[in-house]
Amino acid sequence: YPFAIDWAEQSHGRIIAPGLGIYFMSPKEKDWPLTDITRQLFFLRDIGMGHAYFRSKFFTDNTKGIYDFATDEYGTYPSLIPPMTWAKAASPQKPYNLTFTTQKDGTMRMTWQHQVKDTTMIPFNVYSPTSYPVDTKDARNLVAIRRQARSLLIPSEKGRHYAVTATDRYGNESLALQEAYTADT
């Protein structure tokens, strides 16, 4: 896939999302096997590029199992929109005042605040691994993305740690508000 390498090299720091012709898997088209697409997906991931499916009908119709593969094997973790730093480089202010309150049902309500009061302008990402400090670069730690509410119900689970970041409409993410909370403290 030399075209993808060239696109990545010539991107000038901008997002390039190659469109994968999944319609070619249709028997009415070229009847490609699923492995042709999965090979392209892994290659694009290896060189740090995203992708788009063309046409979405073949994705939602699960042609040759592409939807199952994408949800069960390839895209098992949430992902964030890459930041458009060429449009706006500054990150939003990080959230503050992270608190945990035990609910009657035993769950915890995690709440935070942010200087921007309009909840539609600054969505939040919540991370929760078992290690501290929370690694916000690891998508496996994401438990909620682009959340507009400033609270989240979480299980009362020992050994979990939490961090919250703010994002702007350009995908820029703030520094993390980290809390070394565990359910038994």
Give short role names for the model-derived ranges.
Residues 25, 60, 133-135, 173:
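Flexible, glycine-rich phosphate/dinucleotide-binding loops
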Residues 152-174:
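Beta-strand-rich modules
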Residues 111-113, 127, 165:
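Residue-level recognition of well-ordered beta-strand positions that form the cores
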Residues 115-138:
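Solvent-exposed loop/turn segments flanking beta-strands in beta-repeat/beta-sandwich domains
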Residues 13-15, 48, 107, 121, ...:
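Active-site lining segments that contact anionic ligands and/or coordinate catalytic metals
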Residues 141-148:
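Short beta-strand segments within Ig-like beta-sandwich modules, predominantly Fibronectin type-III
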Residues 1-86:
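Substrate-binding cleft of secreted/luminal carbohydrate-active enzymes
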Residues 68-120, 170-185:
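Pro/Thr/Ser/Gly-rich low-complexity, intrinsically disordered linker/stalk tracts
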